[in-house]
Amino acid sequence: MGMLSEFKAFAVKGNVVDMAVGIIIGAAFGKIVSSFVGDVIMPPLGLLIGGVDFSDLAITLKQAQGDMPAVVLAYGRFIQTVIDFLIIAFAIFIGVKALNQLKRKEAEAPSLPPAPTRDQQLLEEIRDLLKTRGKS
């Protein structure tokens, strides 16, 4: 099997396609959460702690000189990113927890016993015939 055909067989497998879809949806979800945190959560939080905008929090290590830009430790963006991560992690936790509950409910549902095989049916018939013969 050639390299190209092996790659094609690998690429069209369900797991690879599912993973690609998951990555794309995850990236879109990340943008939604970043917007939610930056535009909805952080402004009121900044108001509560005295009007601080987290994205602007920084420590200047070295002032700008001539053409050289300032060296800045932008810890506000880091705080923003940590909050994004925590919200995404919490959302994933809730989703996984819901899936696990659904799986538990499926596992708890009693399943019907499997239908007897043809061999089992024949053995039961033989057993029943032997019982009736022994009684007469």
Swiss-Prot record:
It is a multi-pass membrane protein. GO terms for molecular function: mechanosensitive monoatomic ion channel activity. PROSITE patterns: MSCL. Its main location: membrane. The chain crosses the membrane at residues 9-29, 78-98. GO terms for cellular component: plasma membrane. Pfam families: MscL (PF01741). PANTHER family: LARGE-CONDUCTANCE MECHANOSENSITIVE CHANNEL, MECHANOSENSITIVE CHANNEL MSCL. Homopentamer. Channel that opens in response to stretch forces in the membrane lipid bilayer. May participate in the regulation of osmotic pressure changes within the cell. This is Large-conductance mechanosensitive channel.
